[in-house]
């Protein structure tokens, strides 16, 4: 993820989240939709409206990555295994969750379908 990609803004395959929401439903719909579609990325640590990179403290970032991985594992059927990485953008640490196009469609958030 580069600053140029962030400045390009959100699209049907890229979504920004400033923080990790307390309720995973706020981003789980996107994870499932990306798996049911052509894939996509959620960049945590970037404001969606202003595109400002706010980043995360290095002390908290691994806990946040674990929370994302656990939420996806606990919430999706069939299993979705995203690629969750840390990247430095503009000197700040962001979390990039990359969801590939699924091969076992349809994917569901447990309790509901999101296509």
Which residues does each PLM region occupy?
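Conserved N-terminal catalytic/coupling substructures associated with nucleotide/phosphate chemistry
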Residues: 1-114
């Amino acid at each position: 993820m580069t600053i140029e990609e962030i400045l390009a803004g959100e699209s049907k395959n890229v979504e920004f989240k400033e923080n990790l929401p307390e309720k995973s439903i706020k981003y789980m719909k996107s994870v499932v939709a990306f798996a049911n579609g052509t894939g996509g990325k959620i960049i945590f640590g970037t404001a969606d409206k202003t595109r400002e990179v706010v980043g995360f403290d290095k002390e908290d970032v691994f806990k946040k990555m674990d929370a994302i991985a656990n939420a996806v594992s606990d919430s999706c059927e069939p299993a979705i295994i995203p690629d969750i990485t840390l990247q430095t953008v503009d000197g700040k640490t962001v979390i990039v969750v990359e969801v590939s196009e699924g091969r076992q469609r349809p994917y569901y958030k447990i309790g509901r379908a999101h296509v």
